[in-house]
Amino acid sequence: SKSSTETPPSYNQLNYNENLQRFFNSKPATAPVEFDPIKMDQSYNEPAEAECTVSPVQCFEGSGGSGSSGNFTSGSNLNMRSVTNTSNTGTGTSSESVPLVTLTEALIS
């Protein structure tokens, strides 16, 4: 039997999929029409060493990250990469611009 201290799921948790579908059906304007991330910066070529075929935690640790991963599990087969900012270490700033990604139904499925 379940513990009496367990919180029942909220209305939003119970209706997550319906809310998500309603969001995409509404066709929200999430980015300007002229925005095309592929044409934005074709001069950038990702370095080969950024490719990581091991677990995301191992990939992160291999790129200079450290720490406990806890109980990290993933049910999806996403291609995750670790990003380390070495240009302005410790400043929290970067001179490079990061392209924005439009949230699409395919990204969260």
Curated annotation (Swiss-Prot):
One of its GO terms (biological process) is rhythmic process. Keywords: Biological rhythms, Cytoplasm, Nucleus, Phosphoprotein, Repeat. It is found in: Nucleus; Cytoplasm, Perinuclear region. Disulfide bonds: none annotated. GO terms for cellular component: nucleus; perinuclear region of cytoplasm. The keyword Lipoprotein does not apply. Phosphorylated with a circadian rhythmicity, probably by the double-time protein (dbt). Phosphorylation could be implicated in the stability of per monomer and in the formation of heterodimer per-tim. The keyword Transport does not apply. Residues 59-109 are annotated as: Disordered. Residues 69-98 have a biased composition (Low complexity). Forms a heterodimer with timeless (TIM); the complex then translocates into the nucleus. Essential for biological clock functions. Determines the period length of circadian and ultradian rhythms; an increase in PER dosage leads to shortened circadian rhythms and a decrease leads to lengthened circadian rhythms. Essential for the circadian rhythmicity of locomotor activity, eclosion behavior, and for the rhythmic component of the male courtship song that originates in the thoracic nervous system. The biological cycle depends on the rhythmic formation and nuclear localization of the TIM-PER complex. Light induces the degradation of TIM, which promotes elimination of PER. This is Period circadian protein. It comes from Syritta pipiens (Hoverfly). The gene is per.
